[in-house]
Structure formats: C-alpha cells, structure tokens
Amino acid sequence: MSIGLQYLNKKEKETVNSFVKELREKLGGNILNILLFGSKVRGDFDRDSDIDIFILAREKGDIRDAVSDIAAEYFLEYNVPLAPVVYSLFEYTKNKELGSFFFEQLEKEGIAL
C-alpha cells in the first residue's frame, strides 16, 4: 500500500485514481501537480470527511470550473466526496512567499498523485 494512501478504502482509491487520470487526460497540459492532503492523509478523518485534492495549474482560466464539474460527476457516480482545490502557479508562488500556513501544511503532508 502506498504511503499516505493507507487511510483510503478501495473504492476511494479507485475513485481518486480515475479522477486524477481524467484530469490529466482532459486538462493535462495545464496541470503541473496533483496532491492528496488533509484528514485522509493524516488519519484524523471521520465518516463525513471528504477527500482533499490540491491541483496546481499553469494558469487557472476555466480549469477551476472544469475540475469542479468532473468532481461532481464522480460524486454522483461513485458517491465519494472529492474536494479539489485549484491554484495557479502564480497564486502558489505568491502564497509560498507570504509563508501561508496552508502551503506549509501542504508541503509537509501532501502526497503526489
């Protein structure tokens, strides 16, 4: 079992893998990185927890809406709540320069997908 993915059940793993694959197929040229983070990585989740996925894009443009639409389709089809968070490279760089707590945590716990 992959480190950091041990808290995902089989259905969640399959859903996340399919979601990431579809993102890369549909938006691949704009996607720089995809990370799993949050309670499902740390192990402090509860039965109502969603699956946090960070997506780093070259440019945000229409990608946020496309990602949200795909995540909604996966929820309807698999009943697995995905919570994608999309940042552009510019936003990511600026927030890191400012010492954003979110990005510090993301670097500590994020698992590349």
Please identify what each model-predicted range represents:
Residues 52-55:
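Short beta-strand->loop micro-motif that forms the acidic, two-metal-ion catalytic signature
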Residues 1-33, 41-47, 57-113:
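Catalytic core of pol beta-like nucleotidyltransferases
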